[in-house]
A protein has these predicted regions:
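Domain-level signature for soluble enzymes in the chorismate/prephenate branch of the shikimate pathway
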Residues: 1-178
């Protein structure tokens, strides 16, 4: 398809949270809901920040209680909006990637290892387009106290898998040796 979940800077919902500056972090809990975000964080920590904390794979929601002292945590999604109110420091991975590479970032894309019919791709693309054309209605009918969803869905995230995002995705995958 022609769609993804991407950002061209601040993602707002994919962040490393801590009570101390980066260089003082000793341990990092890794969110269990996104392999892409985990791999992005590992790369940024090693290649850009030059920090090598102990990495702990979170297995459930309880890990957020451990984000204190020199223990940090990668938190994604709605939980990241909650965590913003609790943590002293947060580092947005979309922002960091953009600073390092100058490229957008693709957190998720719909892929298939089998050929898809052109009818399916058209229906899929049409369904995505319907959703994008109704963001205002979606936001209005789902109040959310923690963050401005209109801003989130229209400024922080973007959804078209254009050439620049394909380039960014291929670059990220090459860094992972996949």
């Amino acid at each position: 398809g022609d769609y993804c979940i991407g950002t061209d800077g601040e993602a707002a919902s994919v962040c490393l949270f801590s009570e101390v500056p980066l260089k003082e972090i000793k341990r990092v809990y890794l969110d269990y809901q996104s392999r892409t975000s985990v791999e992005l964080l590992k790369w940024i920590m090693k290649e850009y920040w030059g920090i090598y904390p102990e990495l702990i794979e979170a297995i459930n929601e309880d890990y957020r209680k451990e984000i204190k002292g020199t223990t940090a945590g990668l938190v994604i999604g709605d939980r990241a909006f909650e965590q913003r109110k609790l943590s002293t420091f947060f580092y947005d991975l979309g922002t960091e990637w953009k600073k390092i590479t100058g490229l957008p970032f693709v957190f998720a894309a719909w892929v298939s290892n089998k050929p898809l019919s052109s009818d399916f791709v058209k229906i899929f693309n049409d369904a995505n387009e319907v959703g994008l054309n109704h963001i205002e209605e979606i936001v209005s009918s789902h109040p959310f106290d923690l963050y401005d969803l209109r801003k989130y869905y229209t400024l922080h995230l973007n959804y078209r898998l254009d050439e620049k995002k394909k380039q960014a995705l291929n670059y990220f995958l090459s860094l992972q040796n996949l």
